[in-house]
Amino acid sequence: MKDVTIIGGGPSGLYASFYAGLRDMSVRLIDVQSELGGKMRIYPEKIIWDIGGIAPKPCHEILKDTIKQGLYFKPEVHLNERVVDIRKKAERHFEVETEAGEIYTSKAVIIAIGAGIINPKQLDVKGVERYQLTNLHYVVQSYRRFKDKDVLISGGGNTALDWAHDIAKIAKSVTVVYRKEDVTGHEAMKTLVTDLNVKLCPKTRIKYLVGNDDETHISEVVLEHVESGDTHTVKFDDVIISHGFDRCNTLLSETSSKLDMHDDCRVKGFGNTTTSIPGIYACGDIVYHDAKSHLIASAFSDGANAANLAKTYIQPDANAEGYVSSHHEVFKEANKTIVNKHLY
């Protein structure tokens, strides 16, 4: 039996993992995705400005450090596992069950599932799956791959316009198609992309994808006007889909442990990350409490708070907070390496 099971491997879950390890707890970390990072993996190239003391840098760099930190105390990690139930068997005895039927036990549970399981909405076009490993994209991992390319973006929201704006600076051309008469993203961003000669095509959708000879890459796209039905075919090097996300948050509605909720979509926190069930804590975007702000920095704070509360639940005579890292014995040897690197 572990001390704590953390459900969700985004920034809050990862920091909870680190802080629980710092507090000498054994940790199990479960995530439904194949990689840790949560929603931060959706926008790896976006620049993050609002983490205190951290210079602005691409999200993927912050994510790399966050994962490294979250794994510092060697938690037991389970990826590609969807949690379907949380059961409180007794005080300091919880069962966490996965879709595959695995049952994990721990003395406390921290829920850090963000807005739930998030997956990009798929393009509803026949044969689309054959191109997903080549030049059809649902997430932009790197802008550099689009240098000097003809790029098509489907979608008219903020994410689509953000991608269009950034990619247009290095691509040969960028075309944005969307079903409505106007984009739904910020008006200021529309002006910016227009100034960069991004071609905006309202009331237009992707009708067909035309592959190359071996059907491994998209070579042409058939575009259709949604009102007239008129079509035309255009050559593109890459196609990006930005149609929003499918969200699944059935864990909280179906779990045996019925938690008090806020607006039916977030766990109600009582002053902090405490929930209505002793021994279960919630951190990050999934929890609502009076001091809540939806920032990565706040997710870190929530994670530490949840870990501290789990510690005192498991061990009532423990200190309410952990010892500051600058004077913590657990980092003594690691600090020597860091000091030598920076001072000598």
Curated annotation (Swiss-Prot):
EC number(s) reported in the record: 1.18.1.2
Cofactor note: Binds 1 FAD per subunit.
Binding site for FAD: S12, D31, K39, Y43, V83, I118, D285, S326
Superkingdom classification of source: Bacteria
Root EC class: oxidoreductase
A GO term, aspect molecular function: NADP binding
Residues that span the membrane, as ranges: none
Cysteines engaged in disulfide bonds, as pairs: none
Keyword tRNA processing: no
Catalytic activity annotation: 2 reduced [2Fe-2S]-[ferredoxin] + NADP(+) + H(+) = 2 oxidized [2Fe-2S]-[ferredoxin] + NADPH
Keywords, alphabetical: FAD, Flavoprotein, NADP, Oxidoreductase
InterPro entries: FAD/NAD-bd_sf (IPR036188), FAD/NAD-binding_dom (IPR023753), Fd--NADP_Rdtase_type_2 (IPR022890), Ferredoxin-NADP_redctase_2 (IPR050097)
Subunit: Homodimer.
Similarity section: Belongs to the ferredoxin--NADP reductase type 2 family.
Name the UniProt record assigns to this protein: Ferredoxin--NADP reductase
Protein's organism: Staphylococcus aureus (strain bovine RF122 / ET3-1)
